[in-house]
A protein has these predicted regions:
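Second RecA-like catalytic domain
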Residues: 1-192
């Protein structure tokens, strides 16, 4: 994130930048630059792209910003996922069998991001009720905070990026957005 911000501030030679001690290892800086290039935030010469400029504006990690910017039709879902990942686990830590059974309904086999989306959407459908959250083994305080962060992100995207606001309602499209930003964290089950 800091390397992208430095690029946005016009620092061209990140490797030669005078970081405050302790400076990050050169290998970490090189890896960050390569990652930003793979996200298309930087071009082959290490210059900030238009996409990179937009990513740098966002109060998000470069990966999440890239995922959101991948497709405007998924902005609604992606902003929910961004908010939910920023607040920690919505599960209240209850180990009771009843709570575990209630939580299973939200689990998406495609991964944690879609599970978090399911939790938030169910919370919204239930009227953002504290009682509903408690009945489902969820932390009302965490969900309320995610709701507030999401509202801030919606305001940012609407104001700063002037995007057409849409909801895909298409899990495949959401997964493509996630892959655009988080491809480095993807794994493939090998059957073992």
């Amino acid at each position: 994130m800091y390397v992208l911000q430095l690029k946005a501030l016009g620092v061209d030679q990140i490797a030669r930048f005078d970081f405050m001690p302790p400076a990050p290892p050169a290998a970490h800086v090189a890896d960050a630059l390569a990652h930003l290039e793979s996200l298309r935030a930087l071009d082959e010469e290490g210059r900030l792209t238009q996409l990179g400029e937009r990513m740098a504006e966002a109060p998000l990690s470069p990966m999440m910003a890239r995922a959101i910017l991948h497709d405007a039709s998924c902005a609604d879902e992606m902003l929910t996922i961004a908010a939910m990942t920023s607040v920690g686990s919505p599960f209240d830590g209850s180990e009771s069998v009843a709570a575990q059974i209630e939580r299973r309904q939200f689990v998406a086999e495609e991964g944690d991001h879609l599970t978090l989306l399911n939790v938030y959407e169910a919370f919204q459908r239930a009227g953002a009720s504290s009682r509903w959250a408690a009945q489902h083994g969820l932390s009302y305080a965490t969900l309320k905070r995610a709701r507030s962060i999401r509202a801030q992100l919606v305001a940012f995207v609407t104001r700063q990026w002037s995007w057409p606001w849409r909801r895909a309602g298409d899990e495949q499209a959401v997964r493509r957005c996630l892959a655009a930003g988080f491809f480095r964290q993807a794994v493939r089950y090998d059957g073992s």
